[in-house]
């Protein structure tokens, strides 16, 4: 069960890669917009990567109580990161592309919805009883299933932003580059709680 959860969470790395993907006056405006987003996004990308690494490293050989604690913290961290990413997109203003306002609104709404879903998963994990191994395993399976749904939302949230001129502009920004994950030995403590 834990390996399924870890596999599902690693799919969340797609969001990190999605943020990694973003000529003329339009190109300059797109680059400026992408810089605003990516400068604010970098700490959130790192927070997500650390949270995902904590889940994966704990799931491999952790005790139920350790898995519960790591998953709970990771889901809270990812929810906070998604909220901050939504704020970064909102604060950057309207992207300088056709339907920019709708694009921004959709991305912000989807990121905020994803954050809410991660908090719901956190609650599910918190409610599991790690002393009853069978119920705990069954509960983790439900969490893994929910995680798959959320990851599809995560991917959709930024897929449109990473296309076209915006996608090219975001790809050039250091702040939107793939985060480096902490080593498995550092575990859940690698992700600071402060945003």
Regions found by a protein language model. Name each.
Residues 1-10:
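Bacterial N-terminal signal peptides that target proteins for export
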Residues 17-21:
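C-terminal motif of bacterial Sec signal peptides marking the signal peptidase cleavage site
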Residues 23-26:
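Bacterial signal peptide processing site
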Residues 44-121, 125, 139, 143-160:
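Alpha-helical segments in soluble extracytoplasmic regions
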Residues 171-195:
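Short, low-complexity, Pro/Ser/Thr/Gly-rich segments in the mature regions of secreted, periplasmic
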Residues 30-51:
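Post-signal peptide N-terminal segment of mature Sec-exported envelope proteins
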